[in-house]
Amino acid sequence: MQSVIHSAHRIVVKVGSSLVTNDGAGLDHAALERWASEIADLMRRGKEVVLVSSGAIAEGIKRLGWSAKPSAVHEKQAAAAVGQMGLCEAYERVFTAHNLKTAQVLLTHEDMADRTRYLNARTTLLTLLSLNVVPIINENDTVVTSEIKLGDNDTLGALVTNLIEADALVILTDQQGLYTADPRKHPDAEFVHEACAGNPELEAMAGGAGSSVGTGGMLTKILAAKRAARSGATTVIACGREANVLSRLADGEAIGTQLVAQNDRWAARKQWLADHLRLAGRLVLDDGAARAVTARHTSLLPIGVIAVEGEFLRGDAVACVNSDGREVARGLANYSSDEARMIMRHPTRDIERLLGYVGEPELIHRDNLVNL
């Protein structure tokens, strides 16, 4: 079995609290230097990397002089706000040593649920990756309530994987991977090297093993892998204490548990766009645009749209129909229906003049467009 990381181009790496803190007592700066070095190695290989990092609350607890992790939500949020400053400062320092720039991105589950915010977050992250910047993502613990719970950053890692359509999610933890049972209680438990993400038997195997430092046990990682597989991403759950673990995974070495998505990325996205989104409106295409979208799989430009039907917002799903009214594609609109009516039949260069701003040059980007 070869690690999927060898062939993956876009990777989300989630690093747990126990791998970036001194047993919960503030940040482990030597560990951060190691992660920066390994991620820099991946990027030298031509890979795009997004880092989802825990550690803000633990660093905040240290800076505030508290002896233990608080149980009250408002105190956790205060610790997160204080600690996030130190986390960003530390990551900026260690990545600068490798001539890499970093960007802080704080997200909530609500950002993923709202289509407009979802598209904005996606566009920002993809722009950062195109600029060779390392986005460092954490949950916005200062403003959320229900999300400061078990497994928040495991879930966040999977959501980010879906958001940017990454090829793989790597969840680094202080455990070797998944066993058929808790090896601390069952010495005969067997290690699971590879399985299909979403297999219900995996959840029974996961048990409740987890670190006291972080908030996620193995079950949350299994569920995160299941979520990541929805966009066709394979997940690797591996021990972050293995020497050069990311570089070795990139070499193809089989480390940890690999949970394979059953559908590839494009098949998963096609199913999601075609079957699971409620259509909010229709765009009527001229013959040239209909041919370009269906035959050449191009983005849909405003100049190719001759009519806009219905009322929709940026990020809503819309049907694309030809001049005979037959649906030929559907996708996520970059502009609202009102804006679309203003820019239809116009070349891209006119968007800023017509709207006063330009978001994206296309009405629907080809990555958000599926032919039917």
Swiss-Prot record:
Residues that hold substrate according to the record: S54, D141, N153
Recorded metabolic or biological pathway in which this protein acts: Amino-acid biosynthesis; L-proline biosynthesis; L-glutamate 5-semialdehyde from L-glutamate: step 1/2
GO CC entries: cytosol
Database matches in InterPro entries: AceGlu_kinase-like_sf, Asp/Glu/Uridylate_kinase, G5K_ProB, Glu/AcGlu_kinase, Glu_5kinase, Glu_5kinase/COase_Synthase, Glutamate_5-kinase_CS, PUA
PROSITE patterns: GLUTAMATE_5_KINASE (PS00902), PUA (PS50890)
Known role: Catalyzes the transfer of a phosphate group to glutamate to form L-glutamate 5-phosphate.
Name the record gives this protein: Glutamate 5-kinase
